[in-house]
Amino acid sequence: MSYQNILAERVDKIAILTMNRPEKLNALSYELAVELDEELGKVENDDDVRVVILTGAGPRAFSAGGDIMQMVKSTPEEMAARTDARREANWHLASFRKPIIGAINGIAYGAGAQLTTMLDIRIGCEHAEIQFLAAKYGRANSTWSLPLVVGMPKAKELLYTGRPVKAEEAERIGLLNQLVPCSQLREAALEMAKQIAANDPRMVQGIKQLLHDDIGLPWRERFDAEQNARKNKLKANSPREGFKAFLERKGVR
């Protein structure tokens, strides 16, 4: 299928999805959200894809947030329907079973900032700037996702003030896992993706599910959940076979 608002490409076992509205700073229009959700559905069901990279087109923006002009022009009925669709798309992204790496190539404001908190790993460059704007225009978002990234005290600060976070600070507080020059961003994201894709996809996806499902559980329940998963859902090769395969990949005989 040909998309109007996103680009989709494959590099080995990696899907690279690009929000492609650079003239609008990759603002999240309803159409872009629908296309992104549709492609994510395809990628999730494609066993050849093990990792996803999400980025924005152009040198200025990952995503400037929601498409405000589209919202202003929408009827109440259109707004309600589109809000419901976006809600489901957001949850699909947040609960996506494969790892998603964000290549944060510029500003991520409002809904764009919220989007970054739903990704597993965020790699940014010097142009990255993240700002949670909801309190400034009478809304609330990221209360459920941002504390998992930066911790509750810092999440409160960023959500209450709505202040911008520059790239260096973003890395320091955990909003970015890694900070690289913009000229190296794509390669850095691909290198991380290749490292993940080289591992057993069932284990990687199982670990992600455990991490997400265990949120808020007591420590002992989290321990038991991992043990149960190892016995059942994550049951694969025997430990001996797994270690043997690992050594063979390392060239050890």
Regions found by a protein language model. Give the residues of each.
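Terminal peptide-recognition signature
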Residues: 17, 21, 36, 54, ...
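A general structural signal for well-ordered alpha-helical segments in protein cores
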Residues: 68, 86, 143, 152-155, ...
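Glycine- (often His-adjacent) and acidic-residue-rich active-site loop
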Residues: 3, 56-92, 108, 218
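Hydrophobic alpha-helical membrane-association signature
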Residues: 32-35, 82-85, 185, 226
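C-terminal alpha-helix plus adjacent terminal tail
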Residues: 1-12, 59, 162-168, 187, ...
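Crotonase-fold acyl-CoA enzyme core
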Residues: 94-201
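Catalytic-core regions built around general acid/base machinery
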Residues: 39, 85-97, 103
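Conserved CoA-thioester-binding segment of acyl-CoA-metabolizing enzymes
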Residues: 1-55
